[in-house]
């Protein structure tokens, strides 16, 4: 049995390792060596992900969190049962939850500590593991919540070049780009099923014979959204959502209730590796993890250690629910086949 103190110490050490996107190797090494210290084989794959595979009973479950964080050092400290530090919520708290659920579950589990999630998801796009039956992504949903949908993400670039005229006679490149943005923004709305977004970069300057400008935007896209023709698309990941009647969602509902809480199903307006891995493997995916996502990327990032420890218990129960669901399905199938044989 792994003690609560060991679980807290692992998370503290993981958060202490500064690992912004592109600098994940030290944290990945720590995770691999920690698995090996518990007798679990682990390795670093070709793109830098930390991978551990445990053979056990039930369906194969991929637990995939991310090792990288956004930049910004927050001094790591524990005060009044709360751990402060960059990545404590997004998403080393969920990743540590997955680490211990892997160790404490006698199940078929693939653990993946992914790189570049805060960038262009190189880790998820190049993940080379056996096809899972279910995917759980490590992102803060709150200990009593499970995320069943994320909006998509589209990054596009616009360029304008306008021949010089007298300043009072025409619209320059910057104005054209701003007008283009206002046209796009006019279709924005609120919530999961609406388009939203922001300007990422806007540069405009005068050259010898023209006014030149570039604009990069990022849109959060609802399910079913298709980029307009003619846009220069730098990156596009479609929205993803799972049916709330999925066995995976039902397992979370039961696991959360078993630990004395009322489950909350969430759809988020951000984007995660769930958008990539769910469609890629063609199986149901949700996101789960301790922490308040409103603290993501902020200078106030911190996580309740009691919530973190409880999330491990919830996830272990969820995995047991999934094992039981497969066993029940096999029994029911066997009973049906036996019934057919007797009736024949």
UniProtKB/Swiss-Prot annotation:
GO terms for biological process: arginine biosynthetic process via ornithine; L-arginine biosynthetic process; lysine biosynthetic process via aminoadipic acid. Its EC number is 3.5.1.130, 3.5.1.132. SUPFAM superfamilies: Zn-dependent exopeptidases. It is found in: Cytoplasm. It is an enzyme of class 3 (hydrolase). One of its GO terms (cellular component) is cytoplasm. The active site is at 68, 117 (proton acceptor). InterPro entries: ArgE/DapE_CS (IPR001261), LysK (IPR010175), Peptidase_M20 (IPR002933), Peptidase_M20A (IPR050072), Peptidase_M42 (IPR008007). The keyword Ribosomal protein does not apply. Keywords: Amino-acid biosynthesis, Arginine biosynthesis, Cobalt, Cytoplasm, Hydrolase, Lysine biosynthesis, Metal-binding, Zinc. Its main location: cytoplasm. Pathway: Amino-acid biosynthesis; L-lysine biosynthesis via AAA pathway; L-lysine from L-alpha-aminoadipate (Thermus route): step 5/5; Amino-acid biosynthesis; L-arginine biosynthesis. Signal peptide: none annotated. Zn(2+) 1 binds at residues 66, 90, 139. Binds 2 Zn(2+) or Co(2+) ions per subunit. Coiled coil: none annotated. Catalyzes the release of L-lysine from [LysW]-gamma-L-lysine and the release of L-ornithine from [LysW]-L-ornithine. This is Putative [LysW]-lysine/[LysW]-ornithine hydrolase.
